[in-house]
Amino acid sequence: IKCRGQVVGGLHARPEYNAPVSGDLPTLSAFPDHIWPSLAVRDEIQSRLVAQFSTDFLRRHWLIAFDGAQIELAWDRGEIVGVLGRAEIDELELELKSGEASALFGLAAHLADLGGVRLGSQSKAQRGYRLAGLGKPLAVQPLPDIGGLDGKACITLGLQLWQHHEQLWLECGKEERQQALQGMLQGCDLVAEAAENLAQAPAWLPALRVQQRLLAEAGEEQLSALLHGADLVGLQLAIAAWLHLDS
């Protein structure tokens, strides 16, 4: 059971509870009592549980000692299945078991340097709900209203807009890709403009300006390579780390 938390640039910070499952439906009484509003509510939820989608994947995991921290690296491969179709799972997850969050970003940066990976902004659950027809489809999002927001809040919104449209570009048809690219560039612009107005410009700002230009000038094949390139992924990680560690 994953509870509500905070997501910043691909870093999910939230309480999570695990229990063995012997069939298709979980036994909610196997989870801690304190996570429920009441046991009566828990039992009512149990009686109404219906499977909406399934995730079927093989997980390999390793415990890594890195920069004074213990980090679990999990590699999941499989698929998500819902009434609207299937989607591939092929992802790496890093979970901080002990130590400082800075180590988590450090290890992620090492993985990004290898190339061929990107930060995923959509969880398995979000993708599953879409395949079940219960979630909002991926679509172009307008530039949010930023009136009254401080610089860090604007950078957070800009990064979310950028990553949302990056995912859309990778999944949508050719006719929507230009709109998705414009959404990415709007997100980048929002991040850059907010960063420029801070009292002290972040160290990642020059790299962002370079990536903005490359994204704007890239053809379709070049853009796909850029989105999985070490430089762009490392930049997103640097922004996410700045938001998380400096907040």
Residue map of PLM features:
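Function-determining surface determinants
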Residues: 1-247
